[in-house]
């Protein structure tokens, strides 16, 4: 990247970035800037490609030089990251794998993947603060805020396209570990129940089993049994919102400390057993996919945090 002045950026378009519209490209370069402002600077001719004015639908070509004017990000957006510097630094400790194409991390429970909806900080905002030199960082998939484990981030548009294609074609395998109520029957290896999203009057999003919903399937395997709970491995075949949480509830075995689909009596039992658990026991343990750059089949595992390990050890000791 060349710099024309301390505040104006000149960006040379790479082959990986070619083919996208200039308005979409600017949205990746000007994080936190409203779309209305991006279209305004395009209309006013403040953005130039090869020193010429362009329209928002202009498609970039490799070798194009894009002039990006200084744009002041809203102060509240800038200030949002500063109280979370400790969280940003902590993200560096949970990176499981990184190369020029992808970054994989072990997302902590309680951290959203994206800021928004009243949250000023998310994993992707933290990674952008941690990797300010990265021109592209986008989530390949999502994890619920309270779910921990493997989270895949693309560092190139071509990588994101390849990995999204794998998701669409079911070429990516995700394995989760969940602690559920009661004794999961070994013969129940799959739950197939259509899921429908609902928005409550409070604005809360909830998912229910409904014949009007989308076809959904999760495969299950018993990993370990305890006196009043079971650790199961969950492999979603489809990727619906809250799928594992709703399918375990539908099967009669809700997940521990699930504030939306769980069972308060089960949570109380775990507390009285001295497990120390106070979070959703759902962990994305492994992710298998084809590397978008090398074609190598990769399987990346994320260890459980100490709180989940202590909980399981307590349950083992109580058997």
UniProtKB/Swiss-Prot annotation:
One of its GO terms (cellular component) is cytosol. SUPFAM superfamilies: Alpha-L RNA-binding motif (SSF55174), Pseudouridine synthase (SSF55120). GO terms for molecular function: 23S rRNA pseudouridine(955/2504/2580) synthase activity; pseudouridine synthase activity; RNA binding; rRNA pseudouridine synthase activity. CDD domains: PseudoU_synth_RluA_like (cd02869), S4 (cd00165). Its EC number is 5.4.99.24. It catalyses: uridine(955/2504/2580) in 23S rRNA = pseudouridine(955/2504/2580) in 23S rRNA. Changing residue 144 to T: Does not restore cold-sensitive growth to a double bipA-rluC deletion. It comes from the Bacteria. This is Ribosomal large subunit pseudouridine synthase C. It comes from Escherichia coli (strain K12). The lineage of its organism: Bacteria, Pseudomonadati, Pseudomonadota, Gammaproteobacteria, Enterobacterales.
